[in-house]
Amino acid sequence: MNAQNYTQKSLEAIQAAQKLTIENQNQQIEQIHLLAALLRQENGLVPQLLKKMGITLESFEAAVDAELGKLPRVTGSGREADKYYVARAVDTALNSAEDIAKQMKDEYVSVEHLFLSLIENADATLKNLFRPYQITKEACLQALQSVRGNQRVTSDTPEDTYEALAKYGTDLVK
């Protein structure tokens, strides 16, 4: 993973997943940590995508938090502070996100690539989470198209340009 190929929001999400792992006293970063980090990003794209997909955020976040709580904790004198591992499924998802960015002809790996990769390479926990909410790659791509349009990721802060008109414009017809 080359950090220079990731957008600022993507790197923030990865760092937040690491922090969440430490706070929850988990031994390794799992896909659920990365998903939770993507959901909790301030003005994040993933919550926007989920809303466009017709998903109630509060309900989905509660389900994610419940799964986080089920992860084994490592405490006591044998635990080395701030030492954790990256689960193989997370490594696979990060590598896949880079491939997805290339397929979409984007120059940087953005949060949408991370989210799509988590959907595509979901471990058992995420598959069980996504199934009742009908979160699929196709639904996500459709939501992404409505948010992003034909824009490509050509800077390390592309999320700021998505739906700029809706954020900063005024509808004079209303």
Predicted regions and their residues:
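Histone-fold recognition with a strong bias for associated Lys/Arg-rich disordered tails
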Residues: 1-174
